[in-house]
Amino acid sequence: MRPISGRITSNYGYRVNPVTGEYKLHKGIDYAGNYGDPIKASKSGVVEYSGWISGYGNTIILGHWNGVQTLYPHAQTLNVSVGEKVSQGDVIATVGSTGNSTGPHLHFEIRINGQPVDPLQYIPY
């Protein structure tokens, strides 16, 4: 399921980074949002990380199955702790603009065995 209801503002793929000006891989998709909007777990899983990551700001990482992870960076608040089990649709964080960000949004990534993949291949847009 989609983690947030906002429209997609940036797709997965190579682009000019709006903060650094570098041309590089955008490892996820960006959804427009407002400060405090709920961010929901796209799939059931276990919280592997809940804290600050350089560039990503406040971030939740959920582990799912067979090396699949979902990442939820730039959050305003983090509502879950490491080791906590979450169900699909649970509110795990709220939209913010922490880390390298130009405004409130959710950057959403899916990684398989540590490698980013296009989230739109796995969830509806």
Where are the regions that the model predicts?
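Catalytic cores of peptidoglycan-degrading enzymes
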Residues: 2-125
